Amino acid sequence: MLSVISPAKTLDFETSPTTATYTQPQYLEQSAELIEILRDYSPQRLSELMGISDKLAGLNAARFAEWAPPFSPENAKPAVQAFQGDVYQGLDAAAFSEADNEVAQRRLRILSGLYGLLRPLDLIQPYRLEMGTKLANRAGKDLYAFWRERLTQDLSRAVEDSGTPVLVNLASNEYFKAIDAKRLTCRVITPVFKDEKNGQFKIVSFYAKKARGLMSAWMIKERIDTPDDLKGFDVAGYAFNAGLSEGDTWVFTRRESDVAGA
C-alpha cells in the first residue's frame, strides 16, 4: 500500500536534513527539459504564467537560472524535508527514524510539477512550478500533458512494489489530475477529513491538509499495509466515519471538542 501527497510552495533549504541518506530523482532529464523552457521566460512572463507577484517571479527566474545537476547534499536537499507547509507540518519527516525513512521510500510518493514523482529522500533544488501551470511543451499545452503518461505508469509500478495493490490518495485534486486514475492497475482510496463546526462536519482547509500529512506519517510509522488497518486512523482526534463515507471515498471526522487538544 502506497500513499501519494502534493508538494508545497513553501521551501526550507536553510535547515540541515536529519538524515544523511539520499537518492536521486528519476526524472531529472525531463526536469531539465522543463527548466530550459522556463529559462526563456522573463520574470514578467513568469509572473503572468504562474499568477505570482513580481518579487516571487524574480526569485523563481533566479532559481531556474541556477538549477544545475548533478544534485548532491551540498546543493540540494531531500524532498520530504525541503517542502514545508500544512501537509508537511503534519508529516514531520524530520522526526523519522532511519527505519521510517526506509519504509517511506517504498510507501510514499510526492507529485511535483517540475520533478514528476519523487520519493521522500530524492534530492531537489529550490523551485516553484505548480502542476496546474499551463506551460506549453513538446507533449502539449500544459504539465498534465507532459507528465500524465509516465507518472501513471510509474505510480502503478510503485504501488505493485509496495506489496498491497492499494493507492491512498492524499494529494490535492490539482496534483492527482496528473494521474490517469482509470488506467491505474490498483484500488484507489481517497481519505477526506472533516471537522465539526456549528454541529456539522465540514472540510476546513488548514486542518484537512495537516491531516493528510498526519495520515501519511501514521501509515509509515505504524507500517499500515491493508485498507482495514487504514480505517483505524485515530491521530489528533480523527476517526473513520462509515456513515459519511461512500465507496472508496473514506471520510474521517473530528469533533469540535477534540480540535484544541490535537
From Swiss-Prot:
Q: Which InterPro entries does the UniProt record give?
A: YaaA
Concerning Pfam families, the annotation shows: H2O2_YaaD
One biological-process term from Gene Ontology? response to hydroperoxide
Record-level GO cellular component terms: cytosol
Q: Which domain of life is it from?
A: Bacteria
Family designation: Belongs to the UPF0246 family.
Q: What is this protein called?
A: UPF0246 protein Csal_3046
Organism of origin is: Chromohalobacter salexigens (strain ATCC BAA-138 / DSM 3043 / CIP 106854 / NCIMB 13768 / 1H11)
Write the lineage as a comma-separated list: Bacteria, Pseudomonadati, Pseudomonadota, Gammaproteobacteria, Oceanospirillales
